[in-house]
Design a protein with these regions (language model features):
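Active-site phosphate/pyrophosphate- and oxyanion-stabilizing loops and adjacent acidic/basic residues
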Residues: 79, 129, 151
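Conserved N-terminal beta1-alpha1 strand-loop-helix module at the mouth
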Residues: 1-75, 83-98, 102-110, 136-137, ...
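Flexible glycine-rich beta->alpha loop in the catalytic core of nucleotide-sugar glycosyltransferases
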Residues: 118-119, 159, 166
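Conserved catalytic cores of soluble enzyme domains
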Residues: 86, 116, 123-135
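Charged helix-capping and loop-helix junction motifs
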Residues: 20-21, 122-129, 177
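Catalytic-face loop-and-helix region of soluble metabolic enzyme cores
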Residues: 129-144, 161
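Generic beta-sheet signal
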Residues: 59, 94, 115-116, 142, ...
Length: 188
């Protein structure tokens, strides 16, 4: 089984200094691939997060120096985002629990699709599992996952998972949560 990488989502109610403290601890503890940041803090966090080796994705805003943008799924939104980032950047699209929106986003040029994995299904098959079995574009299991949720989520084969938002409490909590996730992922 391929181990999914970690996709962090920064809250909009913390300072850049606080976020960077948690982010640095998280990167030291596990395989963090990327961080989705609110447009309001993108300018301050992009360069330091990229220095940690992360792809920085701006939620709904212009990419600036970030690696990409994240939009709500929909052909027009994805197409506009694709134009904004050009060929060098990437576009992610949140499709929630909608197979239709996810497929539209993929067809419009999204580089990844974020899905709401809890309870969402297609013909009784969990939506993340369905996506992973029929599509090549990477999938982010977008709802935060706790350790106990991994047993249900991992067989669905997401490419990326979002850790618990509790990780943003402080650097120690971030390190603990990411370490526990990494250890559990490595034993699966």
């Amino acid at each position: 089984m391929t181990i999914p990488r970690l996709f962090l989502v920064a809250p909009d109610d913390k300072s850049v200094a606080h976020l960077m403290s948690c982010l640095t601890a998280a990167c030291q503890a596990g395989d963090v691939a990327s961080i989705l940041v609110p447009a309001s803090i993108a300018a301050g966090i992009t360069a330091p997060a990229q220095a940690l080796g992360l792809a920085v994705i701006v939620n709904g805003g212009p990419p600036g120096g970030a690696d990409g943008v994240h939009v709500e799924a929909g052909t027009a939104a994805v197409s506009e985002a694709r134009k904004a980032v050009g060929k060098g950047g990437f576009v992610g699209a949140y499709a929630g629990a909608s197979r239709h929106f996810a497929m539209e986003a993929a067809e419009a040029g999204a580089d990844y699709v974020a899905l709401a994995q809890n309870g969402a299904s297609v013909g009784g098959v969990p939506i993340v599992s369905w996506w992973s079995s029929v599509m090549e574009i990477p999938c982010v299991a977008f709802e935060p996952v706790e350790l106990e949720g991994l047993d249900i989520l991992l067989p669905q084969k997401p490419d990326f998972i979002r850790p618990s938002d509790a990780m943003w409490a402080d650097a120690e909590t971030a390190s603990r949560i990411i370490t526990e996730l990494r250890q559990r992922l490595e034993t699966k």
